[in-house]
């Protein structure tokens, strides 16, 4: 047994060394096959001799049993956000404020990694808990998923009690591989590495997270008691010595001009990095000076985040293609010479509508400027007329639908052209894709390509046909083995139990969004009651406007739609509201029964998180301010809604006041 114990220790040392070389230094000394061989040897030993499995074993990286959900845990110290700077003037004002308070200052400049903030707690040197940022006060416990990240040490080099914070992210090569795999499986692609990292960390099965090859950079320590550091730079050096991965592209500078030089350098070099960054973080380096400056209610006074402007690149417009949405809107899409924008290769971009094409004088063959709106959605910003080649073609939208040949119309007050043929194949397919989407019936495994195959094979002609599919229908399809068929049929069966609001949104009624679907489902509770409702009744409901009311009634009066609903009923698709009615929630008197409007940017939680919490307390969250509004919660840059609330004398809370009230209830 002594020999076996010695071999286990040797395997630990080798696997930890090879893992560090591969994931942290990006300089492996052995091939993947050698690492895999040693890992499987250790797994086998631990299976046969469980007494040799330790909490810091390299086999923990593989992932464990799936969880039912993530627990909510309060942070020992709130994870605050940083104030933002968008230009040189903002940075110089920040510098002036710092110098007025503490005099001469040295800054620490660090890359702002575009990922997900996490907090890691160590007890006696062992990693025991990892949380998401959440709303800054409370995060989700994702410890098992974080253990699969090789850049996070399961055991520190010193037996310290400490909490560190960092940014979990997905390297670009991992992102590309993941999307290639999803494309092969006809699954929805991730828009960017940040979304992919967030989605991977929220997997209930940590084995799936382990396959995603995430990484992390640690950027701060929560308590400096066990550290000899006197500055942020020394703290990062200490973290390196303890086995953490910090970002080495940091710099100490003596003044704001040094900050600007650092920003200029990484603005031009950001694409050379193997991961995405979305800005630069500037901190007062001296820890005593940080303490002297302190915090506001939502951020440290001694730090600021400079946000990069949206990156713009030039490429060639090769062609313009048209797509038809589920409501018949015809949208022009630019076909581009492939170009890298904000870390991903772009070959298609939105042109929105014909008016935009003409207003921006965009012609086929032009050199055009492309950017990603919010670093996510590619769009053509403008053409470059001075580089226009001879023969560049002015684009004109067709007069008839490219899918069904029906005449296109422009409805009064709209800029888009629309196909109004209810039997247009392109619209029907898009409607099917919408029906199975996540916010609708959420049928996992029924992707675009499979739906197109099913439609072309005449196995489905409407959404109800999905619930009539059999194993015999699905097995002959491309890339549909027995396991995928079994999983898909199980997902279809599960979708029958969705609540009424999922079905309403999935039907694709024009103007009826997720929130309005929820409102109608909660109000009428069953589809049968909705079938008898009048337009006059609907417009009386808050959040249901004239357009929505007219559209819903017209849709549900259609005999074909009523036949479709009966067809769904025949397959036992649920048509009853399953949620808890707001009026039935016994929330806190501070919130219960009140109509509340959220406006402006929130920093300590998302608008969606705030809305859900308010609903859980019996409040009704609406989108517009009226005389019936009880409270307006105003975040940063609150605009006309705040002004209207002030004019009506409505009670106004800041985000911090709202958070304080939440904390009072939770205490």
Curated annotation (Swiss-Prot):
EC number: 6.5.1.2
SMART domains membership: BRCT, HhH1, LIGANc
Cofactor: Mg(2+); Mn(2+)
Catalytic activity, reaction form: NAD(+) + (deoxyribonucleotide)n-3'-hydroxyl + 5'-phospho-(deoxyribonucleotide)m = (deoxyribonucleotide)n+m + AMP + beta-nicotinamide D-nucleotide
Binding site for Zn(2+): 401, 404, 419, 424
Family: Belongs to the NAD-dependent DNA ligase family. LigA subfamily.
PANTHER family: CHROMOSOME TRANSMISSION FIDELITY FACTOR 18 (PTHR23389), DNA LIGASE (PTHR23389:SF9)
Designated name of the protein: DNA ligase
Protein species of origin: Staphylococcus aureus (strain bovine RF122 / ET3-1)
């Amino acid at each position: 047994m002594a020999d076996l114990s010695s071999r286990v220790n040797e395997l630990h040392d080798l696997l930890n060394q090879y893992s560090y070389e591969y994931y942290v230094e990006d300089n492996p000394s052995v091939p993947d096959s050698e690492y895999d061989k040693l890992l499987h040897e250790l797994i086998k030993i631990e299976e046969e001799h469980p007494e040799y499995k330790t909490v810091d074993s390299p086999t923990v990286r593989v992932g464990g049993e799936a969880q039912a959900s993530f627990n909510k845990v309060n942070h020992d110290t709130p994870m605050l956000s940083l104030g933002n700077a968008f230009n040189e003037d903002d940075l110089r004002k920040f510098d002036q404020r710092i110098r007025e308070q503490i005099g001469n200052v040295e800054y620490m400049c660090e890359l702002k990694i575009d990922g997900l903030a996490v907090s890691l707690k160590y007890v006696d040197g062992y990693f025991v808990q990892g949380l998401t940022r959440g709303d800054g006060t409370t995060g989700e416990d994702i410890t098992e998923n974080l253990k699969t990240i090789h850049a996070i040490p399961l055991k520190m080099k010193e037996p310290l009690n400490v909490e560190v914070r960092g940014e979990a992210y997905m390297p670009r090569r991992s992102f590309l591989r993941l999307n290639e795999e999803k494309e092969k499986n006809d699954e929805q692609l991730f828009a960017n590495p940040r979304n992919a990292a967030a989605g991977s960390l929220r997997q209930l099965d940590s084995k799936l997270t382990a396959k995603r090859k995430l990484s992390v950079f640690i950027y701060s320590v929560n308590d400096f008691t066990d550290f000899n550091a006197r500055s942020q730079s020394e703290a990062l050096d200490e973290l390196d010595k303890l086995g953490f991965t910090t970002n080495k592209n940091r710099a100490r500078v003596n003044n704001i001009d040094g900050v600007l030089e650092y920003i200029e350098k990484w603005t031009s070099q950001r694409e050379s990095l193997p991961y995405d960054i979305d800005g630069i973080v500037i901190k007062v380096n001296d820890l005593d000076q940080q303490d002297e400056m302190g915090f506001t209610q939502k951020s440290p006074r001694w730090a600021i985040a400079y946000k990069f402007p949206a990156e713009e690149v030039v490429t060639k417009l090769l062609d313009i293609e048209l797509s038809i949405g589920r409501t018949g809107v015809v949208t022009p899409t630019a076909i581009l010479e492939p170009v890298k924008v904000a870390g991903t290769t772009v070959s298609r971009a939105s042109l929105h509508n014909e008016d935009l094409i003409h207003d921006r004088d965009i012609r086929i063959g032009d050199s055009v400027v492309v950017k990603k709106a919010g670093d996510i959605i590619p769009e053509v910003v403008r053409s470059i007329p001075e580089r226009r080649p001879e023969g560049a073609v002015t684009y004109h939208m067709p007069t008839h639908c490219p899918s069904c040949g029906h005449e296109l119309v422009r409805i009064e007050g709209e800029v888009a052209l629309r196909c109004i043929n209810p039997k247009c194949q392109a619209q029907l397919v898009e409607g099917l894709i919408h029906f199975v989407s996540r916010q609708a019936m959420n049928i996992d495994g029924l992707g675009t390509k499979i739906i197109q195959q099913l439609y072309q094979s005449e196995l489905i002609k409407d959404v109800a046909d999905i619930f009539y599919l059999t194993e015999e229908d699905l097995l002959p399809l491309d890339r549909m083995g027995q396991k995928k068929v079994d999983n898909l049929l199980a997902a279809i069966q599960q979708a029958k139990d969705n609540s009424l609001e999922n079905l309403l949104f999935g039907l694709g009624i024009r103007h009826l969004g997720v929130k309005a679907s929820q409102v109608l489902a909660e109000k009428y509770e069953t589809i049968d009651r909705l079938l008898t409702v009048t337009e006059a009744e609907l417009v009386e409901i808050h959040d249901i406007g004239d357009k929505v009311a007219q559209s819903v009634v017209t849709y549900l009066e259609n005999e074909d739609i009523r036949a479709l609903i009966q067809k769904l009923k025949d397959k036992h698709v649920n048509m009853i509201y399953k949620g808890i009615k707001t009026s039935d929630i016994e929330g806190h008197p501070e919130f219960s029964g009140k109509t509340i409007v959220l406006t402006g940017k929130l920093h300590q939680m998302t608008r969606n998180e705030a809305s859900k919490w308010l609903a859980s307390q019996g409040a009704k969250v609406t989108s517009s301010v009226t005389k019936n509004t009880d409270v307006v919660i105003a975040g940063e840059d609150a605009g006309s809604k705040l002004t209207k609330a002030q004019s009506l004398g409505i009670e106004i809370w800041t985000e911090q006041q709202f958070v304080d009230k939440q904390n009072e209830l939770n205490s």
